[in-house]
Regions:
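Metallo-beta-lactamase
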Residues: 89-97, 118-202
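Active-site HxH/HxHxD metal-binding segment of metal-dependent hydrolases
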Residues: 34-117, 202
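Conserved S/T- and glycine-rich ATP-binding loop of Class I adenylate-forming
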Residues: 19, 56, 124
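A short catalytic or substrate-binding loop motif that flags glycine-/basic-rich loops and adjacent residues
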Residues: 9-12, 113, 125-128
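Conserved beta-strand hairpin/beta-sheet module of binuclear metal-dependent hydrolase folds
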Residues: 1-46, 133-145
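Short, glycine/acidic-enriched loop or turn micro-motifs at the edges of active sites
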Residues: 24, 34, 60, 83, ...
Length: 203
């Protein structure tokens, strides 16, 4: 059985997620935006064994804990290849007055596979060029980062953003998922695909 733990981190209250197997205690980490010590404590409290870090995108509020966290856990880090330009650039500092994250760890080019964690990668550019979502059919769960929120969608006024591309990504990818799918967004509360179809003014 897979379980989700939500951790609110950093000044932007980014949602960092731990998706973990209750039998093996293996875990995936999504978007560790800040507070590596806090994330580590949550991992240790549950005796989890991290297997990989997966990014929905590479803005600073989603990657801030990476340097310290990957020293603690030398595991693969992956993001969509189209997001490398954001990760490798000072433009990952959002808003612009924030400093870029120093000493970012290297990423792997091949999407990690972890037994017991079967998911579909959904490329959803628009908020950033390589934004993506991770859909876990067996748990009816999708991690959307800053592509889709409860009652809102991601901003597109930052470098690499494009409103029409974002809306197309949401409609062509996310809105085709089952309505009962739980949406775990990059900020704010969880929602469902069905609820967003009915109530989100941007869809």
């Amino acid at each position: 059985m897979l379980k989700v733990t939500t951790l609110h981190v950093g000044p932007f209250e980014t949602n960092c997620y731990l998706l973990w197997d209750t039998e093996t205690l293996h875990a995936l980490i999504f978007d560790p935006g800040a507070e590596a010590d806090f994330i580590q404590n949550a991992i240790q409290k549950r005796s989890l064994v991290p297997q990989a870090v997966l990014l929905t995108h590479a803005h600073v509020d989603h990657i801030g804990a990476l340097p310290e966290l990957l020293k603690l856990y030398p595991i693969p880090l992956w993001m969509h290849p189209a997001e490398h330009v954001v990760y490798d650039s000072p433009d990952n500092a959002v808003p612009p007055w924030l400093p870029a994250v120093p000493d970012l760890p290297p990423y792997v080019n091949e999407l990690p596979t972890v037994p017991g964690f079967d998911f579909q990668l959904l490329p959803t550019p628009g908020h950033t060029p390589g934004g993506c979502c991770y859909y876990f059919p067996q748990r009816q769960t999708v991690f959307t980062g800053d592509t889709l929120f409860a009652g809102n969608v991601g901003r597109t006024d930052l470098p690499g953003g494009d409103e029409q591309t974002l809306l197309k990504s949401i409609n062509d990818r996310l809105m085709l998922l089952p309505e009962e799918t739980i949406v775990y967004a990059g900020h704010g509360p969880a929602t469902t695909i069905g609820r967003e179809k009915r109530t989100n003014p941007y869809i």
